[in-house]
Amino acid sequence: MQKVIVFEHGVETLAFFSKELSKCFKEKGISVFVYDLETKEVKKQIRNLRKFWKPGETFVVTFNFNGLRGEDCFYDKDGVLLWKYAKVPCVNIVVDHPFYYYGLLQKVEEELGMELYYQISIDRDHEKFMKRFYPQLKHSFFLPLAGTRY
């Protein structure tokens, strides 16, 4: 994959994580599109997003279902989730226990599909929970928390 879409704003710590990941992606030569969750210019940003992605070259990295929560701007006029329409895989790093996201996990399964959805858990117990209660989840991984140095 050559391109990644990340989200800024929302929860402060998650925005920080996105910013740090963006730096690493850029260092690796991956183009980054930063979607501002608090923008007033939604239509312009969606137009730019559509110009940015290329099927087979783009993926989304998000935290706690940002971009997968049913935000109107990410659906086309027929109600199809843009990520599904463009076949953009979504890597969702879930930092809270997954039982908080039962409804969103159902939404993802129905609207995106399990082939395009990758869930990363930051706790081994969260990963065990996912494997037990969501066996239909094809892509589930553990990634320990990292740190930054200043």
Where are these regions (language model features)?
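Nucleotide-activated donor-dependent transferases that construct or modify glycoconjugates
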Residues: 1-11
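Donor nucleotide-sugar binding/catalytic pocket of nucleotide-sugar-dependent glycosyltransferases
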Residues: 118-127, 136-150
